[in-house]
Design a protein with these regions (language model features):
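Generic low-polarity alpha-helical segments
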Residues: 26-27, 80
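Short, mixed-charge low-complexity intrinsically disordered segments
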Residues: 35-87
Length: 87
């Protein structure tokens, strides 16, 4: 049985925006959605906040399943959920 992970994107009102199989694609779309105001985009997780980058996102998700990370700027925010696809 293979492990297939998917990443779901939700806005801050929990409206579904999309499903992805690639971290690169979901990071691109999350930053594009949040990058509207004057402040930079940050990743918020249980470990704290840090500037949004693909490397940081990959390291936060490494070894975890059913885990949520938030992208935030001064005016917008989205949630990224990593979960396992069940067969």
């Amino acid at each position: 049985m293979t492990k297939i992970y998917i990443y779901c994107l939700f806005d801050r009102f929990d409206r579904f925006l999309g499903v992805y199989s690639s971290l690169k694609a979901i990071h691109r779309d999350a930053v594009k959605y949040c990058n509207v105001g004057a402040s930079p985009v940050y990743l918020l997780s249980d470990e704290g906040a840090e500037k949004a980058s693909l490397v940081a996102l990959r390291n936060l998700f490494k070894g975890k399943c059913d885990y949520e990370i938030q992208y935030r700027s001064d005016s917008r925010g989205v949630k990224v959920l990593k979960t396992k696809l069940t067969e």
